[in-house]
Amino acid sequence: MFKKTRTKDFKNEVFGEEAKKDFLIGAKIAYETIITEFASGNLKNIKSLIDKKIYDQFNQAIRERKEKGHLTETNFVGINSAVIKEHEKKDNILEVTVEFVSEIISCLRDRNKKILSGDPGKIKKVHDTWKFSRDVRSTNPSWLLIDTQN
C-alpha cells in the first residue's frame, strides 16, 4: 500500500528543501523537453525520461498523426508554475505528482496546411498534472514520467 504524505511533510520525509528545489528544476526541464519533442514527433530524445506505457501512448499518437498527414506546430513559451501536489512511497519506489501551469502556442494542420485546431498566433494557458517515479535503490538519479493528466 502506498503511503501518502501531505505536501508540507514531503521535504521532511524524502529530501530537504534544497533537493526539493532541484527536483522541481529537473521536472520543469523534463516537462518542456517532453512537450516539445513529442510535438515534433521525436521520441528518441525523451525515451530515457518516460516509462514504457507513456512511450507507447506517445508513439501511437505520433503514428496516428503521421497516418492522417497532420502536422503540429508548437512553441513553448514558458512555465508559470510547478508545484508538488502529492508524494507517495511504496517500498523503494517514490512517486511525485507535479501540477504545471504553462503557456504554449500550438496548432494542428492538415496536409494542405489548413488549421484543424489551435491558433498559431495565440498563447494558451495549459494546466497539466504529471506523475514522476524513481526507485531509490537505483544509482540513476533520473525520474521517469509515468502518468499525465490535463
Please state what every model-predicted region is.
Residues 70-110:
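Surface-exposed, charged secondary-structure patches
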Residues 2-85:
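Core segments of small alpha/beta cavity-forming domains
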Residues 51, 103, 137:
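Residue-level marker of positions within ordered structural domains that often coincide
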Residues 24, 46, 55, 61, ...:
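Aromatic-enriched hydrophobic runs in primary sequence
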Residues 1-11, 93-97, 107-150:
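Short beta-strand edge/turn micro-motifs at domain boundaries
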